[in-house]
């Protein structure tokens, strides 16, 4: 390639005359003159230019253009990520320090049982005629109060020193599940993230004030999905999971709390000899819907060895209704838990199904490895 053509190409790529002069070992005045002469000769040279040369030049220019666009997009994305991280950090700091919860009085009696709180499908920020973020908080904390009173009733017979909190997913309403969802929420994704995380913190702290030790097992749901189903976003990159992680870190100083991350889409609950699975419910069936018979058959296949971990029961959310179905072995059950939400128009009109808001409370015999008492806790 001649010097004039090279100088013209560098100029086209955005290099200044001084940069070109430095690269070619020339004076700037010589570069200007050389580029001008080359431009004048360009029409004549183009007559002898082959189609392949023109195609190569077009591809080169297109590549340069795309590279510039990618650089700008990357810069914008990095700015957005940094803004999100900064906003989250500032929102967390605004919550203030969270002091450790004083432990309850020890109960040294024998035959202790454990409580299990199945809290699922809060749909944080969902708006219906009877539900919004404020109602969500009221109902969740009402469950905590009722669970405390029921625990006291159980303690009249035996100690209840340990609690497992099973967060079942769809804790946030999200924004990516159906067209028009943006018009059925009262909070942005950012506000959902902060509000639900703080409510999870408050629930765990309430449990720590009642029980000597608390373990959280957390499962994420389909409403926490980021983007559409067609987007190449890993399933575990989920807003529910993000709320759990923030709450977990805010409670990192609680020595009586055990809370691990949840990268898998099915979680395990273990209390002494009691073993159960925690799933959201959209894992079974097509498009997140399955009949009760299909759900139970799925659990039976898992129990027979398809799932590589022996368990007795399965806890399911997702359907916003409270149910219990026996498994084939006559021992285990599939426990389906309701939602804090009420008056869901889609469920009532399209599915002809609706339910009063409720959550689930169990008591577990860790030696016998089974549920000893089951409560449907009404929240309305």
Model-derived segments and their meaning:
Residues 27-157, 365-367, 378-380:
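Basic, amphipathic N-terminal segments that precede the first structured/catalytic domain
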Residues 19-22:
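Short alpha-helical "recognition helix" segments of helix-turn-helix
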Residues 208, 235-264, 272-377:
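Conserved beta-sheet core of the metallophosphoesterase superfamily
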Residues 1-15:
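Short, amphipathic alpha-helical "recognition" segments used to contact nucleic acids or chromatin
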Residues 102-119, 133-247:
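Core catalytic region of metal-dependent phosphoesterases/phosphodiesterases
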Residues 120-122, 169-171, 221-224, 281-283, ...:
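Active-site metal-binding loops of divalent metal-dependent hydrolases
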């Amino acid at each position: 390639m001649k010097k004039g053509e090279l100088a013209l190409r560098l100029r086209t790529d955005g290099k200044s005359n001084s940069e070109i002069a430095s690269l070619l070992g020339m004076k700037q005045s010589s570069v200007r003159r050389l580029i001008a002469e080359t431009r004048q000769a360009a029409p004549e040279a183009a007559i002898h230019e082959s189609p392949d040369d023109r195609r190569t030049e077009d591809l080169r220019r297109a590549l340069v253009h795309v590279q510039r666009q990618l650089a700008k997009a990357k810069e914008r994305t990095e700015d957005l990520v940094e803004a999100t991280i900064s906003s989250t950090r500032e929102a967390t700091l605004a919550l203030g320090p969270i002091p450790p919860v004083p432990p309850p009085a020890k109960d040294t009696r024998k035959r202790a049982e454990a409580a299990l709180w199945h809290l699922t499908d809060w749909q944080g920020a969902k708006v219906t005629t009877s539900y919004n973020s404020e109602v969500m908080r009221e109902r969740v904390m009402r469950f905590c109060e009722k669970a405390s009173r029921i625990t006291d009733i159980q303690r009249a017979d035996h100690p209840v020193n340990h609690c497992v909190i099973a967060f079942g997913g769809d804790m946030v309403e999200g924004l990516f599940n159906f067209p028009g969802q943006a018009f059925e929420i009262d909070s942005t994704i950012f506000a959902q993230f902060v509000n639900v995380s703080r409510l999870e913190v408050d629930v765990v702290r309430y449990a720590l004030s009642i029980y000597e030790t608390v373990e959280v097992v957390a499962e994420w749901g389909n409403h926490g999905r980021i983007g559409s189903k067609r987007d190449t976003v890993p399933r575990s990159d989920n807003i529910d999971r993000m709320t759990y992680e923030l709450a977990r870190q805010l409670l990192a100083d609680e020595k009586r709390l055990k809370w691990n991350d949840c990268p898998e889409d099915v979680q395990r609950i273990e209390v002494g000899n009691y073993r159960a699975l925690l799933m959201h419910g959209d894992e079974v069936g097509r498009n997140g819907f399955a009949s009760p018979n299909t759900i139970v058959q799925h659990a039976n296949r898992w129990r027979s060895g398809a799932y590589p971990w022996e368990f007795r029961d399965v806890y399911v959310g997702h359907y916003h209704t409270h149910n219990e179905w026996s498994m084939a072995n006559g021992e285990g059950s599939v426990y389906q838990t309701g939602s804090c939400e009420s008056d869901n128009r889609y469920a009532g009109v399209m599915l002809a199904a609706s339910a009063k808001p409720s959550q689930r409370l169990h008591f577990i015999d860790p030696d016998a490895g089974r549920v000893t008492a089951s409560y449907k806790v009404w929240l309305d």
